[in-house]
A protein has these predicted regions:
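Positively charged n-region of N-terminal signal peptides that target proteins for export
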Residues: 1-4
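Bacterial N-terminal signal peptides
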Residues: 7-14
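Boundary at the C-terminal end of the N-terminal hydrophobic targeting segment
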Residues: 17-21
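Short N-proximal segments of mature Sec-exported proteins
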Residues: 22-88
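Surface-exposed, polar helix/loop patches in the mature regions of secreted/periplasmic/lumenal proteins
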Residues: 76-113
Length: 113
């Protein structure tokens, strides 16, 4: 029985990892535009970084819901390191959106925690 439950649970993983969701605000910002905003230090850079910080906050909130779970990813992530991480990601993945970068960052941060 335990083996059946485990197989069922593992079969759900790809569905969770590829879930579609509505992206609002700066998450629709394409990576080349983020890199340009970084180079010019425009207001769009700050709104983009704030959007990603909110995304991380939302993930932490969602993770904390089950019975007061203490899941705080990105605890040591500074705004300066976030700006650099996003630029590196966007340079390597110019076809992606800021939301894709945020998702990749969450995966990386979860692996570290």
């Amino acid at each position: 029985m335990k083996k059946t439950i485990l197989i069922f649970a593992l079969s759900l993983l790809p569905m969770v990892a590829t879930a579609d969701y509505a992206i609002r605000g700066e998450g629709n910002f394409v990576c080349p535009d983020y890199v340009a905003a970084r180079q010019t230090n425009s207001a769009k850079l700050y709104s983009s970084v704030t959007w990603v910080q909110g995304f991380i906050t939302g993930v932490n909130y969602q993770n904390a819901l089950p019975a007061g779970s203490d899941s705080f990813i990105g605890r040591d992530l500074t705004a300066v390191s976030l700006v650099s991480w996003l630029e590196n990601y966007c340079r390597a993945n110019p076809q992606d959106y800021l939301a894709d970068a945020a998702e990749a960052l969450i995966v990386e941060l979860k692996a570290k925690s």
